[in-house]
Regions:
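Short aromatic/hydrophobic contact patches that present stacked aromatics
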Residues: 143, 377, 410
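Gly/Gly-Pro- and Ser/Thr-rich, intrinsically disordered tail segments characteristic of DNA damage-repair
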Residues: 1-276, 282-286, 433-435, 440-491
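Short, charged/polar surface micro-motifs in flexible loops or helix N-caps
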Residues: 11-13, 37-41, 345-350, 416-420
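Generic "edge-of-domain/loop-turn" microfeature
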Residues: 38, 151, 185, 304, ...
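C-terminal hydrophobic structural anchor segments
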Residues: 394, 398-453, 458-459
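DNA-contacting surface of Y-family translesion DNA polymerases
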Residues: 7, 227, 237-406, 426
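A glycine-rich phosphate-binding loop feature that marks nucleotide/adenosyl-phosphate handling sites
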Residues: 182-185, 276-278, 335-347, 405-418, ...
Length: 491
């Protein structure tokens, strides 16, 4: 029996939520979601569809939005009566008047609000399908195995998708794009690529469909290849070096044993995924995704600093991150035996011309010093705040260039396991003839007291909020924990 999968993506979700909250039409309002208090370099979390139509990227920085709007208004001014604007408006339809100046709303991010609306929409989906047949891919995107529901509702895949989307629109005012396919890959590609090139209906809804044959006929020659799910810039660059630019190219290579060997040399096991996707094949189903557990678990804490930070302030912020990471481990009942740290430097580090080390290009093509990266083993699995902070600080001091300005921090606890799964060999401590039993006992007592303190802090934080109990360091000038504790996802 042929399967039917549906992928649904809420259109410019954050921006749509902000428009609906203001009783504005999300498809007819120029709005950007960004935190103006973080300077004009802040990344926009969402841009409304109408504002995107002026050539603004969905992930632009605020200053890029400002510059583009200024440019658009300069062009509009040339066509305005007497070269003067009579009014300005953030309503897209009003811009049909040549005397109207383009305006837009800057909405401060409300992550808690977006999560609540996302949960409400998920509840709408559950009116139609069982939880076992739906997978939440992100806050605004889901996969649904619709196979068993088409007969129940007497619809095809397109009709099923439309039924759900219209209910969401009626209930929340938010519209969506959907893809329908015979597997999870094809429905995702139908949504990401095909739906973008078809006209929207009267509700702004776009629904595209793909099966394996249609995929080959319409998308084997599609460029850029990065439009396809799971093909990033790095993969595309390596493919280009082999002379591969399209999914059709990959499928042709897969028919030649020699060329397959070349692919395996570059991509290893991922070659199988590339070839499957080139042919429109995806054997993974929703139950497989839900039951997957990575073999090597880790837990990370990352932070993009609001401004370039010197050594002292970066060290302070990292201390807070290590402190919070250890509490997170205790809260989850897990332990780690390895810390990995990455420090990304800011482009301003090159301003004085004194840096002589390796230079790389960041995501935006700007030259920056190569990041610092290091690993430090803890000796045994632990969630001790003292141990994790001390190890993190020592690792930081070992890898950092104190003359450079930091902009990104990523701290990872690796080889994470449950406390009850700690190997027996780690539970015993070998004491030599020269060790003092009292010292060993004192260390154990210190860890027991520390654990009691950690659990007490977590109890207070869960009951009264993350900022209900803090350490003196968190009140030091330049610390960020108090602000981050009041935000979700950094906003």
């Amino acid at each position: 029996m042929e399967k039917t999968y549906v992928a649904i993506d809420l259109k410019s979700f954050y921006a749509s939520v902000e428009c609906v909250e203001r009783q504005l039409d999300p498809l007819n309002t120029n709005l950007v979601v960004a935190d103006e208090s973080r300077t004009e370099k802040t990344i926009c979390l969402a841009v409304s569809p109408s504002l995107k139509s002026f050539g603004i990227s969905g992930r632009a920085r605020l200053f890029e939005v400002i510059q583009r709007v200024e440019q658009v208004n300069k062009e509009r001014l040339q066509k305005a009566p007497k070269r003067q604007f009579a009014k300005k408006s953030y309503i897209y339809s009003e811009l049909s008047d040549p005397a109207c100046e383009l305006d837009y709303i800057v909405a401060t991010p409300q992550m808690a609000k977006y999560l609540a609306v996302s949960a409400k929409i998920y509840g709408i989906y559950l009116k139609y399908v069982s939880p076992e047949d739906i997978f939440a891919y992100s806050i605004d995107e889901v996969f649904i195995d619709a196979t068993g529901y088409l007969g129940l509702y007497n619809v095809d895949g397109r009709g099923f998708a439309q039924m759900l989307i219209l209910d969401v629109l009626k209930t929340t005012g938010i519209t969506a794009t959907a893809g329908v396919g015979t597997n999870m890959y094809l429905c995702k590609v139908a949504m990401d690529i095909v739906a973008k090139h078809i006209p929207a209906d009267k509700n702004g809804v776009r629904i595209a469909e793909l099966n394996e044959q249609l995929y080959k006929e319409t998308l084997w020659g599609h460029t850029p290849i990065t439009d396809f799910w799971r093909v990033g810039a790095g993969t595309a660059s390596r493919l280009e070096k082999l002379g591969i630019y399209t999914m059709g190219d990959i499928s042709r290579w897969s028919l030649d044993h020699y060329l397959i060997g070349k692919l395996y040399k570059v991509f290893g096991k991922n070659t199988e995924l590339l070839i499957d996707h080139a042919w429109g094949i995806e054997p993974t189903a929703i139950p497989d995704v839900k039951s997957y557990r990575p073999s090597n678990n880790s837990i990370s804490s990352g932070q993009v600093l609001q401004e370039p930070c010197n050594y002292e302030r970066t060290r302070l912020i990292l201390w807070e991150m290590a402190d919070m990471l250890s509490l997170d481990l205790v809260d989850k009942g897990i332990v780690t035996n390895q810390i990995v740290l990455t420090v990304g430097y800011d482009k301003e580090s090159l301003a004085d011309g004194h840096y002589t080390g390796e230079v790389v290009c960041d995501h935006y093509g700007r030259k920056i010093p190569k990041h610092a990266h290091g690993t430090q083993n803890l000796g045994r699995h632990t969630s001790s705040t003292r141990k994790i902070i001390d190890t993190t600080m020592a690792l930081f001091d070992r890898i950092i260039d104190k003359t450079l300005l930091a902009r990104r921090l990523n701290l990872t606890a690796c080889n994470v396991i449950r406390e009850e799964d700690i190997p027996e060999v780690e539970s015993y401590e070998q004491i030599s003839l020269f060790d003092m039993a009292e010292a060993a006992n004192a260390d154990n007592n210190a860890e027991e007291k520390e654990r009691a303190l950690q659990e007490a802090m977590l109890l207070i934080k869960h009951k009264y909020g993350k900022n209900a109990i803090l350490k003196g360091t968190n009140y030091t000038e330049g610390a960020t924990a108090r602000v981050r504790n009041r935000s979700i996802g950094g906003h």
